[in-house]
Amino acid sequence: DWDRAFEGVAWFHITGITPAISDKAATLTLMACQAAKRHGVTVSCDLNFRKKLWTSAKAQQVMRPLMQYVDVCIGNEEDAKLCLGFTPDADVEKGQTDAHGYYGIFKGMMQEFGFKYVVSTLRESKSASHNGWKALSYDGQQFYESKHYDILPIIDRVGGGDSFSGGLIHGLIAYDGDQARALESAVAASALKHTIPGDFNMVSREEVENLAGGDASGRVQR
């Protein structure tokens, strides 16, 4: 009973992994998103393409129709290309993280799907244990690029995407739609997760806020 499930709910988050599991899971994801919108619930989606679960063609067949129900779309350049068919004007294969390469794709996604926010993480892979990390968001009027983090050493990348989404959702709710503060919260939360083993981001709100509001020139420290 999706309508009952969404009574009193403010936010619903999905990822591209769930509909990739099976056709039934894809149908249920669509039904959930439709019910969420009927109840005025904000819907966010981390595209999160997984090539072991489905092909790009199948992903686009399923994910593109879902986007009409999504308010906040999260994904890197590969996700946008493989799930939605958008390609940035940036040489991402060489680790380029120039935010300007994403402006065109963000505008195109916003125009086609009517998102409230489009958000992407930008990773610069220097080595397996050393990454640069930042993010970019667009609200249809302004682009915002977060501060850059130098993460060394990386302890565990698992959970980095989920911690980013969680930080973004928290920020958009707590800071009343302030995309700059929300994005800084998301990037800081994810940067901290890279320094923690395991799936869960075992940090406090205070730690995230301190990092988000601190000096952007230093390395991530805990």
Identify the residue ranges that each predicted region occupies.
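Phosphate-handling active-site elements
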Residues: Q142-E145, G171-S185
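Residues forming the Rossmann-fold NAD(P)(H) cofactor-binding site
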Residues: G166, E184, A188
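Short glycine/serine/threonine-biased micro-segments
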Residues: I14, R157-G159, I196
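Short, small-residue alpha-helix embedded
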Residues: I154-Q179
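Active-site catalytic microenvironments for nucleophilic, acid-base chemistry
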Residues: A35, G171-Y175, L192
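Short arginine-rich
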Residues: S190-N201
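Ribokinase/PfkB-type carbohydrate-kinase core domain
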Residues: D1-Y144, H148-L152, G177, N201-N210, ...
